[in-house]
Amino acid sequence: MLEQMGKQAKDAAFILAQLTTAEKNCALSIIAEQLEQQAPLILAENAKDIELAKQNGLSDALIDRLLLTQERLQGIANDVRHVISLADPVGKIIDGGTLDSGLKIERVRTPLGVIGTIYEARPNVTIDVASLCLKTGNAVILRGGKETQFSNKILIEVVQNALEQAGLPKFAVQAITDPNRELVMQLLKLDRYVDMIIPRGGAGLHELCKQHSTIPVIVGGVGVCHIFVEKSADQNKAVFVIDNAKTQRPSTCNTLETLLVQHSIAEEFLPKLVSHLSAKNVKYHAKSTALNILKQAGANVCEVTEKELRKEWGSLDLNVVVVEDIHAAIEHIRQYGTQHSESILTSSQNLARQFINQVDAAAVYVNASTRFTDGGQFGLGAEVAVSTQKLHARGPMGLEALTSYKWVCEGEYTVRK
């Protein structure tokens, strides 16, 4: 089954690589239109997944990731249209010149080929990845979690029908619909056809891919994100940033998980934060100084464990740690962070610069919420993933991250001396 799927994807990628930007944009436009026109059917299938998720006792955070609404579906269609508006990187000349030999060389962006994406309860990823791959001339094999079986099946049907309407091979976008986990292992070994694996999910999925794949894997997505409130921060504005970073959409990987507060302002600042978040049902996890202050402020708080400081909650749980200064904050991030997104709230330009220079993360913020680490927010279009590794791509992966390059060399029957 996967051998055939891989061959079909490879053949489709050969065709996609030759398409003009206009031809690719036409297909994307039809996909966006079909998402809107088929919205009632898509939402009905998604409702089946939601009902099964509830019956199986899945967490609220997981159900939120799984849920499609009319608003979210429209947002997905809009993201596809935004991808249309973006410059096509394929064929772009990165650099080049003429050598002493007279040989003219250029480094030109090309599609990667076939992308394999393994993800969990995120039906939006189906369209995000498909649209970015199509724009960059890549074929894709998708494997969503069993929680999204109904949603993914209808979304793939919509995309494949749109591709056929555009005169393109429907096998450019394929999905493994069988929930058998052994098929994931087979996909990870399909290096004859697949050029890159992108996992979208928790730490367990990323570890599985790293350990078993014979194909290059993009590592990332797990976000234990921190915000450090330095003593010179505007406290009244800081509570709004923390509110946004923690409560806007707790299930995302760019959500705040651990708040670091400088010791000298902790007794003043933390009660303000508790008051501000009083209606948001935030549960705090803290120790020593922070635990005592939060208890006195009437917060719903318990003692934090070492394991929880490394945990991506994906919920309204928030770790709070009081640190002595910026050095202690940076050291905490070095020890517990996942190199995803880290932020400092401060009025000091010098300390902001120190934080930027010393914190090793895909995205580093000054006086802003970590929630901006997103392809759409960064102007990249719908992202395919957030990479926390350092080779090939880092941070939100947009179009250019789905390309490679080739050296194009032109001569006049030139020979090497």
From Swiss-Prot:
Keywords carried by this UniProt record: Amino-acid biosynthesis, Cytoplasm, NADP, Oxidoreductase, Proline biosynthesis
Identification of the protein by name: Gamma-glutamyl phosphate reductase
PANTHER family (UniProt xref): DELTA-1-PYRROLINE-5-CARBOXYLATE SYNTHASE, GLUTAMATE SEMIALDEHYDE DEHYDROGENASE
UniProt GO MF annotations: glutamate-5-semialdehyde dehydrogenase activity; NADP binding
Family matches, as CDD domains: ALDH_F18-19_ProA-GPR
InterPro entries for this protein: Ald_DH/histidinol_DH (IPR016161), Ald_DH_C (IPR016163), Ald_DH_N (IPR016162), Aldehyde_DH_dom (IPR015590), G-glutamylP_reductase_CS (IPR020593), Glu-5-SA_DH (IPR012134), GPR_dom (IPR000965)
Protein family according to the UniProt entry: Belongs to the gamma-glutamyl phosphate reductase family.
Record carries keyword DNA repair: no
